[in-house]
UniProtKB/Swiss-Prot annotation:
Residues 150-275 form the Plus3 domain. Residues 335-357, 447-482 are annotated as: Disordered. Residues 26-109 form the SWIB/MDM2 domain. GO terms for molecular function: DNA binding. It comes from the Eukaryota. This is Uncharacterized protein At5g08430. Residues 447-461 have a biased composition (Polar residues). Residues 497-551 form the GYF domain. Residues 343-353 have a biased composition (Basic and acidic residues).
Length: 553
C-alpha cells in the first residue's frame, strides 16, 4: 500500500519563505512620531518632547549622512544606510533627495492607507512570516459624487486634443470621427465677437465632415458658426482663464453639461493616444533640455534631465502609464436654492384668473386679425404678449397704473379688461393718484361662450372689473382703435432669463438662451433675418422671428 500524504487546505496564508518587495509596515507611534523616528532622534541626542518638523528632521538626517560619509561613491545621489538608517527607513539604500518624502509616514498626522512604494529602492527585501499572511482589507467609503463632471482643468485635460495629436489621429480615418466627437480643442476666438474676452477659447467637437473636393476633414464645434479646419487648431496648453470661460458658457446653457459617465468613457478612449503623444513630446523636450544643460554647464539639472529621460524610456514605466485609469472629478453636490417649479412663480392674480369662468372664452377669427395678424403672437386666437400655460387667457403683464398687471381676454368682438384692484387707501408706491380709478361692473348682456359645453356663461355680477383711467382711444401711432377695446401695452420679455430655443443649420435644437445672448449674436450678424426662435415649453411650430422678439426688448 502506497504512502499517504496529508495536505493542509489553503487558507490564504503563505506556506513558504520567499523574497518580495513589501510595502512599508504600519508604524507604531509614540506621541507625534513613529517609534523608529523617535529612537533615531534620541540616539542623536535630540529632544522629542515636542514635535519636530519634517524640514528640521530632514536637515538633521542630511547632516548625519555627510558626517558619517554615507553617500554612495559611484552615485552621489544615493545613500548607503548604516544600522540606524536601516532601522529608520527599512532599506539598505535610499535616494538622498527622497529623505523628506520618506519621513512623511513617520508622522502620526500623516497616517493613511495610501501606497508609498514608489519612494523606496527597487531591491528585494527579506520579510518575516507574519508579513506573509494576507491582510484584511477595509472598505474605504469615498465621498459621493454628483451626476455631472466638474468643469476644471484636470477634467478638461482628459479630453483635450492638441493639433499635433489630431494630426496623428488622422492616420486612422476609421476611428478618427469616434475619437474626435465630444473632445475639446483650442481655437482662436472670432475677432468680431466682442463678447469673447480671450484670444483663444476651448470648444467642443460636435461633428466631423470632409471638405468638399479634398480628403481633408473639417470640425464642427460649439460657439462657432463656421466649420473649423484642423490646421487652425492650437498645439499649446489651454489656460485656466479659458477653462473658466468654458465653464461659464456651460452654465449659460451654450454647451451641454457633461456627466461623469460620459467623460470617463471618452477619457478611456483617448487615454492611450494621449499618453503616447505626451511621452513623445516629453522625451523630445528632455533632449533639448539636456543639450542646453550641456552647453551651459548645468551639472545638477543635466543629471535630473538624464534620469527623467531614462525613466520615461523604460518600457515598464511606459506600460504603467498606459495602464492608468483616468479619473474624472465629480461636480460638488450643492443644492441650488434658485431652482423652483414654474408654478412657484405664478402670481396670485394669474392663478385666480386661470380658475375663473374667463378661461372658457371661445376662439374667434376677429381676435386673430384685430392686432395685425402675423405680427402678433397668439394662443388659440387670443392676443398674447407673453405666453402662459393657461389656454384662452392672455397675460399681457402690462404696467398700467404704476406697475399693476392687466389681463385681456377676448370673446368675439368684445374684450374683457381686468385690472388688479387698487389698494384701499388709493396709494401706490407711496404716491397719491391724481384721479380716482373708474370702477364698472361687467355687463351681463355680453355673451361668453363655453368651449366645453357650448352654453353661455354669465359673468359673476359680484366681480369688479377695474378700468384704467389713462386709457385713450388713440394708440402710439395715432391710429384709432375700436372704442370697445382697451389699450394693450406690451411689456418687454425678461432679457436675462434662459427661455429661448432655436434650430441650428445642422438641424439640432440649441438652448435655452437669454434674449441678451441672442441679441448679441444677431448684432454680430450670425443669424439671418428669417431666423426663428421659440420659448421653452412650446413646440417648434410656434417659432417666431427673432427680429420681432427683439423689438420688444
Amino acid at each position: 500500500m502506497g504512502d499517504i500524504t496529508w495536505v493542509e487546505e489553503g487558507n490564504g496564508s503563505a506556506t513558504s519563505s520567499r523574497k518580495r518587495k513589501a510595502r512599508p509596515k504600519r508604524f507604531e507611534f509614540v506621541g507625534w512620531g513613529s517609534r523608529q523616528l523617535i529612537e533615531f532622534l534620541h540616539s542623536l541626542g535630540k529632544d522629542t518632547s515636542e514635535m519636530i518638523s519634517r524640514y528640521d528632521v530632514s536637515d538633521t538626517i542630511a547632516k548625519y549622512i555627510s558626517k558619517e560619509g554615507l553617500l554612495d561613491p559611484s552615485n552621489k545621489k544615493k545613500v548607503v544606510c548604516d544600522k540606524r538608517l536601516v532601522l529608520l527607513f527599512g532599506t539598505r539604500t535610499i535616494f538622498r533627495m527622497k529623505v523628506y518624502d520618506l519621513l512623511e509616514k513617520h508622522y502620526k498626522e500623516n497616517q493613511d492607507d495610501s501606497d508609498f512604494d514608489f519612494l523606496y529602492e527597487d531591491e528585494p527585501q527579506i520579510i518575516c512570516h507574519s508579513e506573509k499572511i494576507a491582510k484584511r482589507t477595509s472598505k474605504v467609503v469615498k465621498k459621493p459624487r454628483g451626476t455631472f463632471a466638474a468643469i476644471v482643468s484636470d477634467n478638461i485635460k482628459l479630453l483635450y486634443l492638441r493639433k499635433s495629436l489630431v494630426q496623428e489621429l488622422l492616420k486612422s480615418p476609421d476611428t478618427f470621427e469616434g475619437k474626435m466627437l465630444g473632445s475639446f480643442v483650442r481655437i482662436k476666438s472670432d475677432p468680431n465677437d466682442y463678447l469673447q474676452k480671450y484670444p483663444y477659447q476651448l470648444v467642443q467637437v460636435t461633428g466631423v465632415k470632409k471638405e468638399h473636393g479634398t480628403d481633408d476633414f473639417l470640425l464642427q464645434v460649439t460657439n462657432y458658426v463656421k466649420d473649423v479646419s484642423i490646421s487652425v487648431l492650437s498645439d499649446d496648453n489651454f489656460s485656466q482663464e479659458e477653462c473658466e470661460d468654458l465653464h461659464q458658457r456651460i452654465k449659460n446653457g451654450l454647451l451641454k453639461k457633461p456627466t461623469i459617465v460620459e467623460m470617463e468613457e471618452k477619457a478611456k478612449k483617448l487615454h492611450k493616444d494621449q499618453t503616447k503623444h505626451w511621452l513623445g513630446r516629453e522625451i523630445e523636450l528632455l533632449k533639448r533640455l539636456i543639450d542646453r544643460a550641456n552647453e551651459k554647464g548645468w551639472r545638477r539639472e543635466l543629471s535630473e534631465y538624464l534620469d527623467k529621460r531614462e525613466l520615461l524610456q523604460n518600457p515598464d514605466e511606459q506600460a504603467r502609464l498606459l495602464r492608468e485609469v483616468p479619473e474624472v472629478i465629480g461636480e460638488e453636490l450643492v443644492q441650488n436654492p434658485e431652482v423652483s417649479s414654474p408654478e412657484a412663480h405664478k402670481s396670485d392674480n394669474e392663478q385666480r384668473l386661470s380658475e375663473s369662468p374667463l378661461s372658457c372664452i371661445h376662439e374667434t377669427p376677429e381676435a386673430r386679425n384685430l392686432f395685425g395678424g402675423e405680427d402678433q403672437q397668439f394662443n388659440n386666437g387670443y392676443v398674447m404678449s407673453n405666453p402662459i400655460t393657461t389656454p384662452g387667457i392672455t397675460s399681457c403683464a402690462t404696467e398700467i397704473n404704476k406697475g399693476l398687471p392687466t389681463w385681456i381676454a377676448s370673446a368675439g368682438a368684445e374684450y374683457l379688461h381686468v385690472d388688479v384692484e387698487q389698494p384701499a387707501n388709493g396709494i401706490i408706491g407711496g404716491e397719491t393718484p391724481t384721479e380716482e380709478s373708474k370702477v364698472s361692473q361687467l355687463q351681463s348682456s355680453i355673451p361668453v361662450n363655453n368651449v366645453d359645453n357650448g352654453s353661455q356663461v354669465q359673468p359673476n355680477p359680484s366681480e369688479v372689473i377695474e378700468l384704467s383711467d389713462d386709457d385713450e382711444d388713440d394708440n402710439g401711432d395715432g391710429e384709432t382703435l375700436d372704442p370697445k377695446v382697451e389699450d394693450v401695452r406690451v411689456l418687454s420679455y425678461d432679457k436675462e432669463k434662459l427661455n429661448w430655443l432655436y434650430k441650428d443649420p445642422q438641424g439640432l435644437v440649441q438652448g435655452p438662451f437669454s434674449l441678451t445672448q441672442l441679441k448679441a449674436w444677431s448684432d454680430a450678424e450670425y443669424f439671418t433675418k428669417q431666423f426663428r426662435v421659440w420659448m421653452t415649453g412650446e413646440s417648434m411650430e410656434s417659432a417666431v422671428l427673432l427680429t420681432d422678439v427683439l423689438r420688444l426688448v
